């Protein structure tokens, strides 16, 4: 994406936010409902894009990428009025007899950077929060899942004006720094690796931009000698194979009691065959 286009996208959103149009309850609700309707209308295209990019089975793709967003939007619509209400807080003695309240206010223009492992859900879910909070947003989808990025841009450009929400496509190593270093976003939401998260935090510090970093890590699992081994094997294999193991909380390694080691390994092998057959790479249920 050209720097001129990025500059225009950021500055137009700053102007639109400063107009105050995004702050009202009615505006936020309307945008959330519009987003939900657009996802529903493009559901099949989204599922097709996820299959082309990652071979995601439709059921797995719906549950992990689309259904979660419906729940998030419904939750926001149900609670938004309560979230926007001023909250009474205690008043310091030195300013008595006054009273004190906290008035929730939108931050401004936010940047949302999504990963490739859940390319739809982990970009749109944070957008739901940004819209509910009354912000404008620029979305940066992963360039590793181009079909999904294209359907996201199609949906967003069809339902939202460019000065409210837009999509910035391109190589992450080029577009990301261009966005973060040159423009003073009011918040950055990033999902990805710790190494890239550190770089984003360092770049954002130039503008004192607060960041939310959802990062990956190691996820050990412990199996005691008195555990139900069959159930444990099924749960662990499901968790490890879901989305081909590309989930931040997917179990990375097991700590098992030595007395059950061989039996448990055999059970896990049998469970893989039960779930995906002798050759998982040919299974339509494997991402």
Residues of each region from the PLM?
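N-terminal Rossmann-like NAD(P)+-binding subdomain of aldehyde/semialdehyde dehydrogenases
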Residues: 1-101
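Amphipathic, non-transmembrane alpha-helical secondary structure
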Residues: 7, 33, 74, 124, ...
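Structural signal for hydrophobic packing residues in well-ordered secondary-structure cores
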Residues: 21, 36-39, 43, 54, ...
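Rossmann-like NAD(P) dinucleotide-binding subdomain of oxidoreductase/dehydrogenase enzymes
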Residues: 93-231
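ALDH superfamily catalytic-core signature
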Residues: 195-287
